[in-house]
Swiss-Prot record:
<feature type="binding site">
    <location>
        <position position="475"/>
    </location>
    <ligand>
        <name>ATP</name>
    </ligand>
</feature>
<feature type="binding site">
    <location>
        <position position="284"/>
    </location>
    <ligand>
        <name>substrate</name>
    </ligand>
</feature>
<dbReference type="Pfam" id="PF02782">
    <property type="entry name" value="FGGY_C"/>
</dbReference>
<feature type="binding site">
    <location>
        <position position="168"/>
    </location>
    <ligand>
        <name>substrate</name>
    </ligand>
</feature>
<dbReference type="Pfam" id="PF00370">
    <property type="entry name" value="FGGY_N"/>
</dbReference>
<dbReference type="GO" id="GO:0042732">
    <property type="term" value="P:D-xylose metabolic process"/>
</dbReference>
<feature type="binding site">
    <location>
        <position position="366"/>
    </location>
    <ligand>
        <name>ATP</name>
    </ligand>
</feature>
<comment type="similarity">
    <text>Belongs to the FGGY kinase family.</text>
</comment>
<dbReference type="GO" id="GO:0005829">
    <property type="term" value="C:cytosol"/>
</dbReference>
<keyword id="KW-0119">Carbohydrate metabolism</keyword>
<dbReference type="GO" id="GO:0005997">
    <property type="term" value="P:xylulose metabolic process"/>
</dbReference>
<dbReference type="InterPro" id="IPR042024">
    <property type="entry name" value="D-XK_euk"/>
</dbReference>
<dbReference type="InterPro" id="IPR018485">
    <property type="entry name" value="FGGY_C"/>
</dbReference>
<feature type="binding site">
    <location>
        <position position="97"/>
    </location>
    <ligand>
        <name>substrate</name>
    </ligand>
</feature>
<protein>
    <recommendedName>
        <fullName>Probable D-xylulose kinase A</fullName>
        <ecNumber>2.7.1.17</ecNumber>
    </recommendedName>
</protein>
<dbReference type="GO" id="GO:0004856">
    <property type="term" value="F:D-xylulokinase activity"/>
</dbReference>
<dbReference type="InterPro" id="IPR018484">
    <property type="entry name" value="FGGY_N"/>
</dbReference>
Amino acid sequence: MASQGPLYIGFDLSTQQLKGLVVNSELKVVHISKFDFDADSRGFSIKKGVLTNEAEHEVFAPVALWLQALDGVLDGLRKQGLDFSRVRGISGAGQQHGSVYWGENAEKLLGGLDAGKTLEEQLSGAFSHPFSPNWQDASTQKECDEFDAVLGGPEQLAEATGSKAHHRFTGPQILRFQRKYPEVYKKTSRISLVSSFLASLLLGHIAPMDISDVCGMNLWNIRKGAYDEDLLKLCAGPFGMEDLKRKLGDVPEDGGLHLGKINKYYIDRYGFSSDCEILPSTGDNPATILALPLRPSDAMVSLGTSTTFLMSTPSYKPDPATHFFNHPTTPGLYMFMLCYKNGGLAREHVRDAINEKLGSPASQSWENFDRITLETPPLGQKSESDPMKLGLFFPRPEIVPNLRSGQWRFNYNPANETLTESNDGWNNPSDEARAIVESQMLSLRLRSRGLTQSPGAKIPPQPRRVYLVGGGSKNKAIAKVAGEILGGSDGVYKLDVGDNACALGAAYKAVWAMERTPGQTFEDLIGQRWREEEFIEKIADGYQKGVFEKYGNAVEGFEKMEHQVLEQEAARK
């Protein structure tokens, strides 16, 4: 009977909750259980899942909280009636960059769990350090400077590891940790990422790190497929490179590797089968691109408070402003990522200014913003001879490019490539509605243009499809402008998986790892089973001949504008 077929669990261990999502072989979701850290945990004085030490800009989570959460989610699935004996494979997604420090007795404690007690009761003593740094932590500026310098500069670090140094990345965090707590570091037997920590709990021994998530450390040389020894030496300091290598462990290349059977604790406590396999867990961003069969050169744009752009690509072209990771399942592909701080908040500022001008200051409706965006011609050009209106709108400091908060407006003439900072001809705030969406999308196109290929005869390089997720994906005007600028020969689609993308991606990864035929890629297996009509809706046209090319000219002006503003700001300091 189909109803007795195999099931697969995908976990998502994020900052504020642990989620367990169960799918069958046909990728249909049959159960979801959540454990909200603030609402459901006992004994932790956390806020939004974390603790803070503002004096040192530290943000971290108690690891014991996650132990409590895993039992909590599994209890929730049991109450929903999940038949654990049908679960054939488990994978997971973890908040990226966070590290867990295991003590000398970790393996013994993991291997000797008693099903009559909770994980928290038995494993709280398994860690040399009780906390895990969170991605919001900003305590490592000194260490980041050292990481950026050790290979010759941020460009060289990005070339080797896929990213320049970032506060949240695991390498700078480990360097600071071994300096701040040398005795604790010495007694640390192993270091896990949040993703491999989750897999370790399920396996009953320390799991290896995942081939994609390891790229979020500033330690893994992506080109060489090995840890970078110069970076390990810096990170390990007086304790030595070989000691750190042992702490980190080997990294298998196969994202679908069978790590081993589930630990006896879960068989006895919850009724899992002794044949249930544990698969590598990956990071939350890599898991997101597994929530659908994302083809090479397809793009995902997450339009939340911040903006995240994800693309699967065969090209490895790192830059200090971007991130590259190994693809979590498919050798020869990479995940390209852009992260912006100014996303939805910046658009809301313009929306509110427009509503106030039109006499409804308390309104949070997007109706006026959308209407004006669609009524305004591309780049504010009423005729071809008019200059293009370009701007940067940053209510909070930005990282791409690295600029203070502020607003800058320019007029650009593509015929003679002249760029003038000016409010002339700008009717604010109305002109800013389209200009802010264009500004955000032009930045994405500028930074991803070297990674796209032509999807067909006489069509310029661009994504095949653009998938929008997050709150902004509900906005038809944003979708239309996204298609005009980014292209998408097959159109612009809204991906509607709620906030389940990471857990779904992890569950799909488990299905693929357990049911693939030899050599079968994730994209092929999931592509055959994924019911497109249930998850996506075409919401805008993509490539439009003439309009796309016009925005290609605007990208040149946009790049000039960024350089000019950066130079002006450098001169001010």
